[in-house]
């Protein structure tokens, strides 16, 4: 299973890779094409969700962002994200968020 993350923040990358060592970080949507699971940071790549869905129609897309940014959450869902989580819930346990959608 190939897990790809469109996450640019180094601290976020560190937290994700500590929980999901097999993750591959990419800097653009083209890097997501052959992934099974794709993580998207909505703060930096929120507008990319629809393009990622187009390039990887069968992948599970898990997006995270600020809990107060309801508009971005709705846009991510409309763009094809399977799961959209507040940052706090996603980072509580990234591996569980990818497996179950919402962590413990």
Feature map (PLM): residue ranges:
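Receiver (REC) domain switch/output surface
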Residues: 96-104
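Mid-chain, well-packed structural core segment of small domains
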Residues: 49-83
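Output/docking surface of receiver
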Residues: 81-92
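Short acidic low-complexity segments
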Residues: 25-34
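Short secondary-structure boundary segments
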Residues: 42, 65-66, 88-89
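Conserved phosphotransfer microenvironments
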Residues: 39-52
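Conserved acidic segment of CheY-like receiver
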Residues: 2-9
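Two-component/phosphorelay signaling modules centered on CheY-like receiver
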Residues: 10-26
């Amino acid at each position: 299973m190939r897990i790809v993350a469109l996450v640019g923040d180094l601290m976020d990358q560190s937290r994700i890779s500590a929980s999901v060592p097999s993750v591959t970080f990419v800097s653009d949507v083209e890097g997501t094409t052959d992934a099974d699971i794709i993580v998207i940071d909505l703060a930096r790549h929120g507008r990319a969700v629809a393009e990622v869905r187009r390039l990887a129609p069968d992948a599970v897309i898990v997006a995270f962002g600020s809990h107060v940014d309801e508009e971005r959450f709705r846009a991510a869902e409309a763009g094809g994200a399977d799961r959209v989580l507040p940052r706090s819930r996603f980072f509580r346990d990234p591996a569980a968020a990818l497996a179950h959608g919402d962590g413990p």
